[in-house]
Design a protein with these regions (language model features):
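Flexible gly/pro-rich beta->alpha loop and the following alpha-helix that scaffold active-site loops
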Residues: 1-30, 43-44, 48, 52-53, ...
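Short glycine/proline- and charge-enriched loop/turn segments
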Residues: 1-3, 55, 60-62, 127-128
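Glycine-rich beta-to-alpha active-site loop
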Residues: 31, 36
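Structured adenosyl-cofactor binding patch, chiefly the S-adenosyl-L-methionine
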Residues: 40
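Anionic-ligand binding region
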Residues: 51-78
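Conserved hydrophobic/aromatic beta-strand scaffold that supports enzyme active sites
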Residues: 70, 116-118, 128
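Catalytic beta-strand/loop cores that center a nucleophilic Ser/Cys/Thr
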Residues: 76-122
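Acyltransferase
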Residues: 129-161
């Protein structure tokens, strides 16, 4: 599939409002790709609107969008608890990324060139990954692990007897 991008300000407005509503309600939030960027913006961070040297992050014009990319999951993060700390090969296809990480968030993963590939809140279950665990051309185990963590975070606490 050739890659292309568009801007939809209304979709961004609605997405930011939904993210903020879930955060304010204390609900878990999992963002993938643009969702990760919007989590950062929601907390006051910024994004890189167009990565100049994109070759690590997506296919070129007319090529498949998603490529294999090696990222480093940082130890001591929620993402490391879910996926394991250290290097991880993921599917990537983006020309934008988190730039300045919002003060309430921390970096959870980085690409080899330093681009932020994961952000999270240190105490609330708010997590964003720039990569695409849902791409079935790559391993699906990271997707299953992320979804299991997300579902567990949203499950009601067991009642004490």
């Amino acid at each position: 599939m050739p890659n292309s991008y568009g801007v939809d300000a209304e979709a961004d407005r609605v997405s930011l409002a939904m993210i903020r509503a879930y955060i304010d309600a204390g609900r878990p939030v999992l963002g993938i790709c643009r969702g990760s960027q919007l989590i950062n913006v929601c907390y006051g961070g910024t994004i890189i609107s167009d990565i100049t040297d994109y070759h690590l992050h997506r296919g070129g014009p007319g090529e498949h969008l998603f490529i294999d990319e090696k990222v480093e999951v940082l130890p001591g993060t929620r993402l490391a608890v879910i996926l394991g700390a250290g290097p991880l090969v993921v599917r990537s296809g983006h020309h934008q990324a988190v730039d300045n990480v919002a003060g309430e968030l921390r970096v959870a993963a980085r690409a080899l060139d330093g681009i932020v590939e994961g952000v999270e809140h240190p105490t609330d279950w708010v997590l964003g990954v720039q990569f695409h665990p849902e791409d079935d051309d790559g391993p699906l185990e990271p997707l299953y692990q992320l979804l299991a963590g997300f579902i567990a975070a949203g499950a009601p606490a067991p009642e004490a007897h």
